[in-house]
Structure formats: C-alpha cells, structure tokens
Amino acid sequence: MSILHATILTVFPEMFPGTLGHSLAGQALNKNIWSYDVINIRDFGLTKHKNIDDEAYGGGNGLIMRPDVLGSSIDHALALNPNAEMYYPSPRGRVFTQSFAKEMLKNKNLIFLCGRYEGIDERVIEEYNVKEISVGDYILSGGEIPTLTILDCLIRLLPGVLMNQNTLSSESFEEDGEFKGGLECSLYTRPEIWRNRAVPSVLLSGNHRLINEWKKAQSHMITKLRRPELLKDL
C-alpha cells in the first residue's frame, strides 16, 4: 500500500509538522501511514540577504514572491517527489471539501506551495500547472495553516488512521454516509441529566429503528437551518 507523502514549500519550515505531529495524524506519522518533507523557500533566495520577493509590476500594495526563486525551490521539490500533484492555497482556488479531499487522494504524492506576502507570480502557476485550493472565503497570513488543515483532513481518510473506519460514514459531508452529505446530528453522552438538560429519551430507548430515524431527522433539520445549500442534492 502506497503511503501519502507531502512535500511542503514554505518560508517557515518550523511550522511543520505542527499540529500534525499530535493525536491521530501524529500517530499515523509514527506508523509511517503518511510522511512529509519540508523545503525552505528562503534557501533559494537571491543575494546574501536571501531575498524571495519584489515589488509588483503595475503597482499595488504588498510584495510578490519571485518566480525565479519559487521555480528553483519547486524544481528541487519535483526532484524529490517527481509524480506529485501541486497545490497552492489561495482565496482564488477551488473550495476544499470532503469530496475534494477524496479526489486529491487519488495521487498519494502531493506538493504544497505555501505563499506569503501579497501572493506569488502568476507565471509560476502557469509553468507548473499548479492547482489553487481555498479553505474558505477569508484571508490568512500565508499558506501554512491551510496546508495543515488540508493535510489533517486527508490523513483522517487514510486506512489505519481511525480506530474504527466506519466512523467516517457517520460524519458531516459524507455523501455516501449516514447523513447523505448533510450535517451530523446532535451528540450526547453521560450524565443523562446535566444542569436540568436531559438527553432525548429516544436515545435511551434501545430501539435502533427509532434512534436512526431521530438521527436522520436531526441531521436534516440542522442542515436545513445552517447549511441549506447542502440539501440541494438530497
């Protein structure tokens, strides 16, 4: 079985593995279910100051990461991971979803280009057929946090990461799962009564048919209230 391997291009290599070195992802890393290497873009910087950015042609605010610097670092990454698919976290990109995550895993070799400043030179995207990917309609300081987020999602989907792989079928957004791509139902555990709030009686009934019906109804109601666009295909 091929493992997931991620090559990460960044100016902050110390940010990795970060949260991915803990909990499920960290355990999976220790089991060699996935692996990673980090390339410091600044190692390919220009002059003794290791410059990696410059002013934008046409004016505008902020600095742009230079294509010659990025090109050298990407060439190095491709030498290490030659068959990899390359992704650039960007607000212009295709929105990352659970189904997109499964699509990404068709290639277990991935490169993530973490941008900084105002962004990267467009010619880099064109030259290397880089796929832009967005984690939402908001702006972050760089691509490192989106990369950590995307990798966390991908790692959870790998066989052997979750103790019970069936857990995936009862989670939000799983199109083939219990809630058909909608949001997960409300969850309860002990104590049965907490601060005068009781667990719904149906969950204590032992009647699996009624419990399943309640869960599906809850999922539909929550999805309709909070993410109605997810119901269009249900």
From Swiss-Prot:
Binding annotation for S-adenosyl-L-methionine: 115, 135-140
CDD domains cross-referenced by the UniProt entry: TrmD-like
GO CC terms of this entry: cytosol
E.C. code: 2.1.1.228
Pfam family of the protein (one): tRNA_m1G_MT
Main localization of the protein described in the UniProt heading: cytoplasm
InterPro entries reported in the protein's UniProt record: Alpha/beta_knot_MTases, tRNA_m1G_MeTrfase_C_sf, tRNA_m1G_MeTrfase_TrmD, tRNA_m1G_MTases_N, tRNA_MeTrfase_TRMD/TRM10
Domain of life: Bacteria
Coiled coil regions in record: none
UniProt key word tRNA processing: yes
Reaction(s) the record says it catalyses: guanosine(37) in tRNA + S-adenosyl-L-methionine = N(1)-methylguanosine(37) in tRNA + S-adenosyl-L-homocysteine + H(+)
One GO term (biological process): tRNA N1-guanine methylation
Enzyme type, top EC level: transferase
GO MF entries: tRNA (guanine(37)-N1)-methyltransferase activity
Keywords noted in UniProt: Cytoplasm, Methyltransferase, S-adenosyl-L-methionine, Transferase, tRNA processing
Record localization: Cytoplasm
Family: Belongs to the RNA methyltransferase TrmD family.
Function: Specifically methylates guanosine-37 in various tRNAs.
Subunit structure: Homodimer.
PANTHER family for the chain: TRNA (GUANINE-N(1)-)-METHYLTRANSFERASE
Protein name: tRNA (guanine-N(1)-)-methyltransferase
Organism annotation: Rickettsia rickettsii (strain Sheila Smith)
Name of the gene: trmD
